[in-house]
């Protein structure tokens, strides 16, 4: 079986970390051990420095929306070229915490950047590279933010108003619905039901590979 790139997407508080572990466990059950785990933004020394700027900003200078967007893509291509593509070439599966869909949703939907700009930037930076499977953990923004606040202090993105996250969710759904490479999981259910739905959908996908 050819190595695949699987990405978990979703709003804050959607349960991505739990879902990632469930994906890793499901892969192991199919004999796929020790996948490369990545996160965005971040995942390489340079990309982690960019992550810090994106997440926390700078006390003496505001980070503009365009600078944020370009930092995200700079961090992304560092990760893709230096970690993800080499791992796939070596036959290792990759499980990612966020990828390009997050930028399309947060910056395109939430920040309001033009769709054509977002698509052109994606195509310029990534070309035709994309995940083999994206698992989108869908959750109502209000519930998701309640969960996120329960984890502790929020970063600069998590502090955005709820309308930002409603716009981001709408774009996530727009990108996910009727997309054969995306599985949508209702993350607002109980953990037991989320786990069951995710396991069933992922096993069905793996059996077809």
Swiss-Prot record:
SUPFAM superfamilies: P-loop containing nucleoside triphosphate hydrolases
Residues annotated as binding ATP: 10-17
GO BP annotation list: dTDP biosynthetic process; dTTP biosynthetic process; dUDP biosynthetic process
Keyword Transport tagged: no
TM ranges: none
Keyword Kinase applies: yes
GO cellular component, one term: cytosol
EC number(s) from the headed UniProt entry: 2.7.4.9
Role summary: Phosphorylation of dTMP to form dTDP in both de novo and salvage pathways of dTTP synthesis.
NCBIfam families reported for this sequence: DTMP_kinase
Name the record gives this protein: Thymidylate kinase
């Amino acid at each position: 079986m050819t190595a695949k790139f699987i990405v978990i997407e979703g709003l804050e508080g959607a349960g991505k970390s739990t879902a990632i572990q469930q994906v890793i466990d499901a892969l192991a059950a199919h004999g796929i051990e020790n996948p490369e785990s990545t996160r965005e933004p971040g995942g390489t020394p340079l990309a982690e420095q960019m992550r810090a700027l994106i997440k926390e900003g700078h006390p003496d200078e505001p980070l503009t929306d365009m600078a944020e967007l370009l930092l995200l893509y700079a961090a992304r291509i560092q990760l893709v070229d230096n970690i993800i593509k080499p791992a796939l070439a070596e036959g290792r599966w990759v499980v990612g915490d966020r990828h390009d869909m997050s930028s399309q949703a947060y910056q395109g939907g939430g920040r309001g950047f033009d769709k054509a700009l977002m698509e052109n930037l994606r195509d310029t930076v990534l070309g035709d590279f994309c995940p083999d499977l994206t698992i989108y953990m869908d959750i109502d923004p209000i519930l998701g933010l309640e969960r996120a606040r329960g984890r502790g202090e929020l970063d600069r993105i998590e502090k955005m108003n709820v309308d930002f996250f409603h716009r981001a969710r709408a774009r996530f759904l727009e990108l996910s619905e009727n997309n054969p490479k995306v599985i949508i999981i209702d993350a607002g259910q109980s953990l037991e039901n989320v786990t069951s739905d995710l396991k069933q959908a992922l096993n069905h996908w793996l059996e077809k590979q």
